[in-house]
């Protein structure tokens, strides 16, 4: 289902990505090995690949993706998907120039606040690579609790060709 929703906070604005965002997304997010290190996808090979992802993969099926804007600039991405009818899983990434400023915590908090109005959502989860302290901090600041370390749970192709350990965070929202 297409995402048309805009969420806004004091520092960030979340809006659906459009094809015109491809160059900025490629330059700041999709081509940066620092950003993609702990993601499930490899850096894009060019703007054309980013354009293709925007038009074919974002906001398809049960996933909603937002572009994170800071001062009108492309700063990151965040998404949520429904692995089960009653649960939502969150994911996100942010360009390094905006790390350490609480921006992704604000973006995730906006997604969580929006979910509270959905009576069909009972649980929210997110996981991050076990070594990704920054992401774990975002999830803790947003009120998710560490539920455990899952051994060899997810692929991070920019780290290894073998499954890696993750930290699983969760929260009941009703």
Annotate each language-model stretch with its function.
Residues 1-24, 28-32, 67-174:
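Acyl-donor (CoA/ACP) binding surface of acyl/acetyltransferases
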Residues 42, 57-60, 118, 127:
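Histidine kinase transmitter module recognition
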Residues 46-48, 61, 158:
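A short hydrophobic/aromatic micro-motif that marks alpha-helical segments and, especially, helix-coil
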Residues 35-36, 45, 60, 121, ...:
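Generic macromolecular interface patches on structured domains
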Residues 54-67, 76:
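A short helix-loop-beta-strand connector motif used in the catalytic cores of GNAT acetyltransferases and
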Residues 34-56:
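Conserved GNAT-fold acetyl-CoA-binding loop/helix
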